[in-house]
Each structure stands twice: as structure tokens, then as C-alpha cells.
Amino acid sequence: MMLFKLSIKNITKSIKDYAIYFFTLVLGVAIFYVFNAIDSQTVMLNVSSSTSEIIRLMTTILGGVSVFVSFILGFLIIYASRFLIKRRSKEFGIYLTLGMSKRKISLILFFETLIIGAISLGVGLALGIVLSQLMSILVANMFEADLTKFQFTFSSSAALKTLLYFSIMYLIVMIFNTIIVNKCKLIDLLHGNKKSEKVKLKNPIICTIVFIIAVIALSYAYYLVTDVFGTSPLMNTISGILIPIALGCVSTFLIFWSLSGLILKIVMHLKKYYYKGLNSFTVRQISSKINTTVFSMTIICLMLFFTICIFSSALSIKNSLSGNLKDLAPVDIQFSKLQESLSKEEKENFSKDIIEDYNTTAKDTLQRLDVYKYLKDVVDINTYRVEEITLKDSFGDQIEQIGKDYPTLAYNVREDLVKLSDYNRLAKLYNKKELTLKDNEYVIISNYKMMADIRNISLKNNTKLTINGKDYYPKYQECQDGIIELSGSATNTGVIILPDNALEGIHPYKNILAANYQADTKEEKENVEDIVSTIINNHFNKDTLLSYNTKIDIYASSIGLGAMVTFVGLYLGIIFLISSAAILALKELSESTDNKERFNMLRKIGTDEKMINKALFNQIAVFFLFPLLLAIIHSIFGIEFANYILKTMGTESLLSSIILTAVFLVVIYGGYFLVTYYCSKTIIKER
């Protein structure tokens, strides 16, 4: 009981030392609970069965991510406990001097960890429960759901999971603390804070060579990620993508290692700056620990890089996948059937019923299955493919240059061709602009920007197409926006619209039927879709190969995938950001503890408090900014890579999400910086 009371007294006395530790634990618990309680928030949402499936998948993935997050938080808690033991080394040394056994000191630490853990769990869970109510609004917004049934929710499963995971973490910390105390020597505990790392000036020539090599390797890694799917064959495989990642990690370490030897040497030669104010003291302070911070700086830099990229990308995913759905899925349902003649081998693999149905249109099949009566606003068209019009033919004389710039394109794939009258009927249904053509003109419609840009190269050069001996020329010098089939993203790489007579006598490649349901309300449409999908699914691969795609399914999968990526990104991003900032904060607080005597010496020789505070501020600022600056440089190229990928989903700008990411960094990272500075000021003022 006496040791327990002493533990409470120690916590009360050292409340300032525990501030960042406690704050980080509370944030960790709250975030862990919030993201594991998402399933409880979705229960109240009025969503379709397709969306419910996506939500269940998302919660399963978040559960898996939580295991990874628990390892990160566990490492962070152990790292923080090392700081607290070091901070109180003299106190423990006095306990040993007074005759207290190491077992009792371990017991004191056990009680302290237990108390801090229990309080942080309680406060963190309370904060998490409050934040999870706000998360309900975000989840509802993500899934465009009705929140009329909103009510206060508490996830017992998330709470139990949080208690279990963090209890295991605290137990590991207790074991770790016991091992540390048992290995400590009395002299180290009493005088450990007076030890300092000897400043070792690395060979500047070697450092310069290493720095140049690192910059070249990093530049090559940047080139690879910005040249994705371009001229570099390395980026065409998963293993190839790992090459710039490995180069980036190694180069980051080498840059920090080389700069740790160059910065001090360079600054010492800048005598006007070096001897101004307390700059010489500040530089020496930074250098005194520089050799042990290279690896940790590398890890923190990479974590910050990951945070910036994942925030910037994840916050754009939702808009990327759901922002243009009204244009991409303008009708309720679309059916399609291949019309090309079956080969002998294919006929042997299909049943008699399928072969009989194969030569009919989608409309015929729907009428036979008694599905057509559920549809209205019906438009059916054919698409065509001919051997003489491939992607290579569409590029004409520009094929050589385009082939060099984009070697991975499938140039021998036949182009999709559509009659002008068919397209205009479909465009009218889709609320798209109708087209007009002369007898010798064609238009290419595409909404996939990257492919449209490539096609525009040949269109600007008036590339002709030849069908049945007749030449056709582009009406426009660029692709026109348009779609034929429903999709969840802007992936129409190009469809060629031709005058009707150009395709007369050619056998159709595919028959497409687009329509709306004979229903008005959302609930009625969902009921009709259930009926239609059940009928089609029951007959598919039995007596028909009719396939279909629906607006409801597209919305559910696109919005669900966007929400999934966003939540996982936010979860990992916040944890990585907190971990990076907390590690730096604890390291700086530890250094402030080590250097307390040096700051006291400055006071004794007459240095005013303002200069001391400025020196402390500069020292902490360098440690916080150093990894952040390199992470930002990495992120410029990482975001460029992410932007390329996002363009395939319809997003062309990450500006808004980058601004939001900057806000996150300023609030969380900047907040830790300020707390570290003010806590360090308090530490160095202690006598």
C-alpha cells in the first residue's frame, strides 16, 4: 500500500513529465476506438444491401489495420516509457541509495503504469465515444445515407477490443520497465544525465561523396515514380515498383548520415553566424546527439512522407470515385450481350439453350425472361469491331512517337465503333450532347483524360481511318466527352462514332440496352432491382450470357471503396503523424533533461533568459523541421505518382486535399512542437 501511495505521489509530482506521454496515450486510445466503432455507427444508416456488404468489408479491413496500428502504438508507448525512466533516473538512484530494492522500484513503476494506463484508457474511451458520434455524420456523408434514425451509440465490441489491445501493450511496458530497472547500475542512475555523446567530426570528403551518391540515387527514384507506365520498364511490375521505394529509404538514411557530418563542418566555417549569439552553443547541442538520431530521423522522415501522401490521396479518393457518378451512371440499368459468332470450341463448351439465346438481342432475352416489363426509356444499340481499325490504326503516322512514349498500350486491340444514329439516341437518354457528321467524318468520344490526351495527338494531325475502302477524317481535333456503357469511373478509353452507312453490312460485336426502372422512389427502384437481378442471376450461364450493370451497384461499390480507402488512410495517417511527432517530442524532452546543467551554466555566466529560450527554440525547431523538410520533398514526387493514379478515377487536382493535409500537419505536428518547447523550457529552468 505504501508503494501504491508513493506511485500516486510521484505521478502528481511529475505531472509535467507525463503530459506528452498521457496526451499521446489518450489520443491513441480515442482514435483506436473511433475507427473500430464504425460498424456500430453504420447500423443506424438506411442503406441498400450492396452498401451494407461494402460496410462489412470495410470494418473487416479496419480490424486488420488495427492490428498493425497496435504494434505502432505499442512501440511508441515503450519508447515513451524509456524517456520517463531516463527523466527520473536520479530519483531511482536515490531510492537505491536509501536501501530500496530494485524489485520495489519495479513495483512502483508497475503501479504508475497501471494508474496512468487506467486513466488514459478511461479518458481516451470517453473522448473516443464523443468523437465516434461525429464519425457517424462523416460515415453518413460518405455513404450518402439517411441519418433520420441517428441516435447515440456505444460500441461494446470496440471498447472491449481497445481495452484488450492496450492492456496487452501496458503489460509489455511493465515487463520492459522491470528489465530496464534490473539492468541499471547505481552510478548510471545518479549521474546518467551528466553523460553526453562525444561530438565526432566525420570526414567531410567521405560525407560529401556519400551525399552526392544519395542525391543521385534519390533523383533516380523520383524519376522512376514520375515516369510510371512510361518509358521505364521497371515500373511495369510490382517488384519494379519496390525499387524506387528501396532507393528512397536508403537514400534518406544516407542523406541524414552525410549531413550530420557536413552541417557542423559548414557552420563552423561560417564564423560570423557561428559566433553570433548562442549559435555555437545551439550547433554543438544539436551535434552532441546527431550520431544517434540518424536512424530515428530516417524513420520519422519516412513516416511523415507516408502521412502526407496518404492524407493527400485518401482525402481525394471519395470525390474521385463518387464525384462524377451522375454522369457516369445516368440510367438505372444497362444490359449487354456479345454478338460475334461463336467458334467451334466455344459451342462445345456452351449448352444448347445458351447457343440459341446467343444470336438474339438483349431485348429479346429480356422479353423471354419476363424482365422487359420492369423497364422504361429503353434504348438499345450495337457496337462494331473490324480488323482494319485497331488502336494502332487510330494513331496513324504518330504511332512511332506514341509507341516510344507509351510502350505499354495494347496497340493491336480492335477499336469500338458505333453508328451516329445509335449514339445520338443513347446520348439523348444520357443527357449528353448529340453529334452531327458529314459522310466522311468521325468523332472519338472518351472521358479517360490520359487516353484522350494521347488520342488528341493523332486527331490534331487529321489522322484518317479507312473502312471498306472509304476514308474518314476527324471532325474535331480532340476527343469529345461521352460514354456508351455505365461505369463507376471515367475509364472510357475511346469509342469511334461514324456515319451510319460506314457500318452497314458489318456484323455487330456487342448489343447494349440501357433503360430506367418502372419505378419512381428509391425504395421502389431497389425492389425492382432485386427482382430483375434475381431473374438474370438465376438464368446466367444456364440459358443466357446476358450481363448487366446497375446504377445502385455502381454507386454502392464506388462510394464504398472511396470510404474504405479514406478511412484506412485517415486511420494510418493520423497514427503515423502522432507517432512521428511524439517520438520527436520525447527525444527532445530527453535531451532537455540531459542538457539542463549546460543551460544552468549559461545562466551562471550571465546569459539572459531570452537568449536561452531562443537557443532552445532553435534547437527543437531544427529537429522537428529537418525530417519534415525532406519528407515534403519526397511527397512532391509521391503525390505526383498518386495524382497519376487518381486521374484514372476522374480526379485531376489534389489541391484541396493538400491544403487539408497541411492543416493536419500544422495542428498535430505543430501542436507537439509547441508543447515540446514549453515543456523543455520548464525542464531547463529546474534547479
Language model regions located:
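Selective transmembrane-helix segments that form parts of the transport pathway or gating/packing helices
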Residues: 15-21, 109-127, 163, 167, ...
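Nucleotide-cofactor and metal-assisted catalytic machinery
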Residues: 325-563
